[in-house]
């Protein structure tokens, strides 16, 4: 079963071709790292997958239905999004922000109670932000806000979560905990697509990596098979060597 499919996507910005003939599908349990250098087209691709940009050619289907034919609410019931940054308009509490994840299902005016309230509480604890539940979102650090948005996505109960550079602003410990959480969610059958320019994040938790280079899909496969010294030289113009320890793969500068 395919959760989402991108079919021969092309996108132009003026005379510049940003994406060219990009095709792939997302299945239940996929934990996909979208890897590429700055300017490779990752953010543009995510915005097309979310229905925020219309491709010049090709289409995206969500559960077999063309994305452009679905309402924003229908999309939100199936797809959750965690942006790289979020500037709130009002000083809502952390609990209020997380509970907003239920809006696509419950609608406006619904107060989270019963099972919904339990979902919010579980997400707060899972992300290690239970102590922030009554704090205004506007007073949080960038890393704390990121964890709140991920908790909101979990509460949304969508089949697919798309994250734009999810470890941005997180300290080392919270980076590792977040990557482990994404791995657990995929093991439960959710689909994850997260963009990154850091190959170590793809190696740490993803079970599949899509490599985007100059607007084209360069590779699609298991991280340890796809990410090589030659690939990193092509993507980032750096010479590295591969080191293995305790069954894990690392790349260090030559």
Tell me the role of every PLM-derived stretch.
Residues 235-254:
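ABC ATPase nucleotide-binding domains
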Residues 58-66, 75:
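Conserved ABC transporter NBD signature motif
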Residues 50:
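Helix-to-loop junction immediately C-terminal to a conserved catalytic motif
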């Amino acid at each position: 079963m395919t959760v989402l499919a991108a079919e021969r996507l092309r996108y132009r910005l003026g005379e510049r071709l940003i994406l060219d003939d990009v095709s792939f599908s997302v299945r239940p349990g996929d934990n996909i790292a979208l890897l590429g250098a700055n300017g490779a087209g990752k953010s543009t691709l995510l915005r097309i997958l979310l229905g925020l940009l219309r491709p010049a050619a090709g289409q995206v289907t969500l559960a077999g239905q063309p994305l452009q034919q679905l309402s924003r609410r229908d999309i939100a019931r199936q797809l959750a999004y965690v942006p790289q940054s979020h500037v709130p308009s009002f000083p809502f509490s952390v609990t209020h922000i997380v509970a907003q994840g239920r809006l696509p299902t419950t609608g406006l005016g619904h107060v989270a109670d019963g099972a919904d309230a339990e979902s919010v509480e579980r997400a707060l604890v899972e992300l290690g932000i239970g102590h922030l539940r009554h704090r205004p979102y506007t007073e949080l650090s960038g890393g704390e806000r990121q964890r709140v948005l991920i908790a909101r996505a979990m509460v949304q109960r969508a089949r697919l979560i798309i994250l734009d550079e999810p470890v941005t602003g997180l300290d080392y410990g919270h980076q590792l905990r977040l990557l482990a959480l994404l791995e657990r969610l995929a093991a439960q059958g959710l689909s994850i697509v997260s963009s990154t320019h850091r190959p170590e994040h793809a190696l740490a938790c993803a079970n599949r990596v899509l490599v985007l280079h100059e607007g084209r899909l360069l590779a699609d496969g298991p991280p340890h098979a796809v990410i090589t010294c030659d690939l990193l030289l092509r993507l980032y113009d750096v010479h590295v060597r591969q080191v293995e320890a305790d069954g894990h793969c690392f790349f260090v500068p030559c």
